[in-house]
Amino acid sequence: MTNLLRLIDRISPWLLGPWRPASIVGYVVAVVFLCGSLAVIGLRITAQTNHEIDPFDQGAYVGMSKTMEGSWYPWYSDGTRNPLFPWLAAILLDPNDAEFFEKGKQLNVALAILATAAVSAFFASRVGPLAALNSCALCSLAALLPISTFFGAEPIFLVLFLFVCACAMRLLNENPLPLYLLLGVLTALAWLAKSSTTPFFILFLGFSIVRWLLSLSFGEKMPWHLRAPGWRPGRFLAGLLICLAAYFAIIAPRLVHAHKTWGSAFYNLPSFWFWADDWETCVNKYADCRQVRLATLPIEEQPTMQGYFHRHDLGDALVRLTNGVVVRLVQLFHPEAKWRLSVERKDKPKRIVLPHRGLYLIGLAALALVMCGVAASQGRLEKLGPITLPVLLSLTTFLVYLMATGWYVPTGPGHRFIMTLYMPLLWLVVQGGDQLRAISGARLANWLYLAGHLAISVLLLSRVVELLQDTRFEKISYAF
């Protein structure tokens, strides 16, 4: 036993960090293997599944690509979807090609692989080698690869939203002006992919104002978990102006098009469908929600908050919200709703790229809590620094998106809405756990953390090998 513990102590630095030249080489090789595997698996799936262009999202994106053929900038919207992905498809492919839809899916797989490479660098800059590799693999297998087999904006949006969250969290504790510029650019690009970035951006602005007021009122007299020496109140207003200027400069062509077409720069049909009772009503009655059109409808038929509460009472609203939240929690953490290890039938085509995707999140969160307990027992939590505002922003974001997507279930039941949170949640629990392990300075923390991540590595590697050996899919479930 003593020799085993010595061996574990010897290999721990190579797997948990700090990074060494050999660790970097091994990590790069592993990421290249992962990206190559994603290419093989993803292209096989696109060749086997999803050959019918549906009349809604995928069909609409195809139509948007044709409209933006030859465009110098992503400016066009159909009132529901944003233009970044169809614009890229129009630039990199020929929208008039009979195989445009199939090639567009292949392009999306390629974008998912590029996103995986970007995510690998992101995690490598924040956690140790093993945790970074597991995080990268989970992002790709659980989120990026499944949705990339469709013709849609999600792969681009998911990785951009992760970077937006990371940049915003950092800006709550240190605020150099270039970081505000970066946030404005990233948020604008994410919004051009999908407008789902907007609630988080608003929350960030609110928490930034809280940080500003705290700094002006208390200065360095705040407790350790709020004190942020790298955050300067004098930079806030200038940084905010830089951020907003970059944001609106990038999305301006899209806003101009919307204003000319529908009379409102931020016209967006899903914001009206949010208050509808079901998808059929959206299709049949709410295809046009311009103000002049809504004015012709009785109040109780309008897709607005006022219209909803003319049709329903508070009890109905609470039932809808509660039921929707339960649906979204199941979709995020345990979509299979089966507790056996294998959810697939032998000799049958697959439907899931990574089974039990949410249980990995739960396991990593539990591991982070264990690391927190060890660090607290050592009296070293203060070494974490100013964590309160980033943690509160994270929790608020989770609750807001959970309730918003839960409310939206009757009109938008797809998994992709709640999967917006998967990669940011993964980043938070992994980086939090790694930092807590490091500050604890305890051998026990290293042993437990190493054991947990080695177990995850074995599970993920076995799944990749299994998919390489047998990539027969009849459809992709729990993604779109």
Regions found by a protein language model. Give the residues of each.
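Transmembrane-helix motifs of polytopic, lipid-linked glycan transferases
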Residues: 106-127, 159, 163, 167, ...
